[in-house]
Every structure is written in structure tokens, then in C-alpha cells.
Curated annotation (Swiss-Prot):
Belongs to the HesB/IscA family. It comes from the Bacteria. It comes from Rhodobacter capsulatus (Rhodopseudomonas capsulata). GO terms for molecular function: 2 iron, 2 sulfur cluster binding; 4 iron, 4 sulfur cluster binding; iron ion binding. Transmembrane segments: none annotated. InterPro entries: FeS_biogenesis (IPR000361), FeS_cluster_insertion (IPR016092), FeS_cluster_insertion_CS (IPR017870), HesB-like_dom_sf (IPR035903). This is Uncharacterized protein in nifU 5'region. GO terms for biological process: iron-sulfur cluster assembly.
């Protein structure tokens, strides 16, 4: 379904450990918005929803709702650090186009 690189897994694990409370995992979302029409979102989830896909990558659980699954099939998620800062990147083969920031697509 999706690929999460080792650096991304480590960043997610650090966020979960820093949450201060138990979480079910990291939710990946695709929402309307951004400069290209759709945008990626991520949030720590206290509990999974019944229709979520629950994927495990190492020590990290990722939750994905059915609508998001349609948009991110085959996506590679990475975490990069460079002179411009640090953050997650999404390489989505389903995106027809993307904006320069890499956070939204259509």
C-alpha cells in the first residue's frame, strides 16, 4: 500500500513517544485544501476507527481511512533534513500535479 522510510519511522516514533499519553498510531489524511486541491495531513490518534486500515512499520502504527487510501496507494513517505528545515515528504505516484511545497497535490 504505502512505504515509510526508516528516517520517517524514527520521526513518527519520536512524535508518539513525545505525546505524553498512549496513542493508537499516526493518522495519515488527505483533505481538501492546499494550493493544488488536496493536501496531506498527519495527526496522532488516540484510537483507531472501525474502517481504518492499520499498518505497522517497525514500531510504528499508521492509521488510514478509506478515502485517504484511494489517494495514497503506492506513496513513499520520507523524513528529510536540509538547509531549509526538516519535515516529511510524500512521493505519490497518483498525483497528477503537485505544488512547490510538496504538501498538496491533485
Amino acid at each position: 500500500m504505502i512505504e515509510i522510510t526508516q528516517p520517517a519511522q524514527e520521526a513518527i516514533k519520536a512524535a508518539i513517544e513525545g505525546a505524553g499519553q498512549p496513542v493508537a498510531g499516526l493518522r495519515l489524511m488527505v483533505q481538501a485544501g492546499g494550493c493544488a486541491g488536496l493536501k496531506y495531513g498527519m495527526a496522532l490518534e488516540l484510537e483507531a476507527q472501525p474502517d481504518d486500515a492499520s499498518l505497522t512499520f517497525g514500531e510504528v502504527t499508521v492509521l488510514i481511512d478509506p478515502l485517504t487510501r484511494e489517494h495514497i496507494e503506492g506513496t513513499k513517505i520520507d523524513f528529510v533534513s536540509n538547509l531549509e528545515g526538516a519535515g516529511f515528504t510524500f512521493d505519490n505516484p497518483n498525483a497528477k500535479s503537485a505544488c512547490g511545497c510538496g504538501k498538496s497535490f491533485c
